[in-house]
Amino acid sequence: MGTDSRAAGALLARASTLHLQTGNLLNWGRLRKKCPSTHSEELRDCIQKTLNEWSSQISPDLVREFPDVLECTMSHAVEKINPDEREEMKVSAKLFIVGSNSSSSTRNAVDMACSVLGVAQLDSVIMASPPIEDGVNLSLEHLQPYWEELENLVQSKKIVAIGTSDLDKTQLEQLYQWAQVKPNSNQVNLASCCVMPPDLTAFAKQFDIQLLTHNDPKELLSEASFQEALQESIPDIEAQEWVPLWLLRYSVIVKSRGIIKSKGYILQAKRKGS
């Protein structure tokens, strides 16, 4: 086992929190898998390669410090937005709550995305449906704590517009009627319905909600898949001690040309019992 893995394992054994950021995937060059078959495969590949890169650059000073929060970054790929170009860019994000039942994860994710990209505000954040137990139908009560936090972030000007994902007409209507800050978009997975449901289309049109399509799996990142990626990258670790709390995927698009300038992932994980 390499020294890199031992040092990384020692740090992870003492830390309570892991922040992982891939930087701009467009800057990865040959490191990036050319044709990942799924979003889940791309994500897992990104997690492993970011962990490997971080492990290989651990300094003796860091090992002596044993920080409580580990910043695991693909350092050469980090790219902040030039303030002079900010008005020309649209910064969008999709937030996936994984192993957290705390709505504060929403604020943490948005704050971290703003910091990583060097911006004061995100133009749009779509919230993937929070995890619920098998056999339980998603209800307004499941969405409310996360949506309230998104509303707070809109009111404090950290986000311009907020949207939902995979809500049917009834769920979207309930959220719309209850919410102070209304959803301006709802993503629909075309793998589950080849044609937009007419009742959803009619409701969205009536209330000026944009219907978008996506092809994310129901579970983009599971606790098990994260732990497997962690174990493979850093064998000298008790990977089952670590739980991913949330994952944020962002993209930066040049408005006038519609091209992607930057895209990447940010993730927060916590060690159990810490």
Curated annotation (Swiss-Prot):
MF GO annotations: glutamate-cysteine ligase activity; glutamate-cysteine ligase catalytic subunit binding; glutamate-cysteine ligase regulator activity; protein-containing complex binding
Disulfide bonds: none
Keywords: Acetylation, Glutathione biosynthesis, Phosphoprotein
Tissues expressing the protein: Most abundant in kidney. Also found in liver and testis.
Pathway assigned in UniProt: Sulfur metabolism; glutathione biosynthesis; glutathione from L-cysteine and L-glutamate: step 1/2
Single GO biological process annotation from the record: response to nutrient
Modified residues (N6-acetyllysine): 263
Subunit: Heterodimer of a catalytic heavy chain and a regulatory light chain.
Protein name: Glutamate--cysteine ligase regulatory subunit
Organism: Rattus norvegicus
Gene Ontology CC: glutamate-cysteine ligase complex
